[in-house]
Amino acid sequence: MKEGMSNNSTTSISQARKAVEQLKMEACMDRVKVSQAAADLLAYCEAHVREDPLIIPVPASENPFREKKFFCTIL
């Protein structure tokens, strides 16, 4: 019974150490305000709008996924 408790506390200590390491890593990360991140994202999207095929469709002649116009007849 004592061995089971020891194993449980070892697991708990291991999990706590992992949590502390994760928190230390997160504390060192540079933070950006949401308003600044949103402004940066909007500026990026506006700068690359001409390259976005979801906004400006790919011309049919360049679209590799266009429907093929070949017709087959089975005799």
Swiss-Prot record:
Localisation: Cell membrane
One cellular component (GO) term of this entry: synapse
Organism: Homo sapiens
Signal peptide: none
Subunit structure and binding partners: G proteins are composed of 3 units, alpha, beta and gamma. Interacts with beta-1 and beta-2, but not with beta-3. Interacts with KCNK1. Interacts (via C-terminus) with KCNK2/TREK-1 (via N-terminus); this interaction confers ion selectivity to Cl(-) and L-glutamate.
Similarity comment: family membership: Belongs to the G protein gamma family.
Record-level Gene Ontology MF annotations: G-protein beta-subunit binding
UniProt modified residues of type Cysteine methyl ester: C72
Role played: Guanine nucleotide-binding proteins (G proteins) are involved as a modulator or transducer in various transmembrane signaling systems. The beta and gamma chains are required for the GTPase activity, for replacement of GDP by GTP, and for G protein-effector interaction.
The protein, known as: Guanine nucleotide-binding protein G(I)/G(S)/G(O) subunit gamma-4
Propeptide residue interval(s): 73-75
Keyword Iron tagged: no
GO biological process terms on file: G protein-coupled receptor signaling pathway; negative regulation of cell growth; regulation of G protein-coupled receptor signaling pathway
Covalently lipidated residues, kind S-geranylgeranyl cysteine: C72
Tissue specificity statement from the Swiss-Prot or TrEMBL entry: Brain, kidney, pancreas, skeletal muscle and faintly in cardiac muscle.
UniProtKB keywords: Cell membrane, Lipoprotein, Membrane, Methylation, Prenylation, Transducer
Its membrane topology: Lipid-anchor
